[in-house]
Amino acid sequence: MAALCLADADDAALEAIGVRRVDLREMDWAPWAAAAETVSPLLAAQDDDGQPHANDLLELNYPAGEVLKRCSEAVAPFCDPSQLELYDAFSLHYDSRQTDTTFNQHRDPSFVTINVCLRSENVVGSRVEFFGAWDGDGSGQRLRAEQQAGFALVHRGRHLHQTTPLVKGIRSQAVLYWTRRGVVGDDDATYLGFAE
């Protein structure tokens, strides 16, 4: 079992385990934050009120290609960004009215994940925790990344991670799953329990 992390990791520590932060503040995220916070009628019928809700960004023409272009230097150590195709794009919205704001340990159904923080206001908690190195079994160092509005976290989909509980505030994000064109298995996912 990995040791508990107590503080947010700096960008150098995150980069050492294969997680890169990219500044995307030049893009206008306000409309996308609003879209993330509005529950579609279909999802309203399916979602549990106590859970973070997700909206499908593929239907809303989210600028995924532009995000990938701006994150290309962060993606390049993993693969040539031109080899990637968008597998899925969705938003998540967390607020203190929800009863469960965690996302248990998991590996994403992607080769590369780009997680864009659309909005973060007065947030306590709600960090993304990474377990070990991206190519490991989840043991070893455990690092926590703060989600900063207008910034993206870029990581390998295989990197074991989870979202810690939101104690207070509001956070919305866009999650982009990218797979390699023509490669089978990039979309395999693993879901485990929450690690205290």
Predicted regions: what they are:
Residues C79-A195:
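Catalytic core of non-heme Fe(II) oxygenases with the double-stranded beta-helix
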Residues M1-Q83, R97-D100:
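Non-heme Fe(II)/2-oxoglutarate
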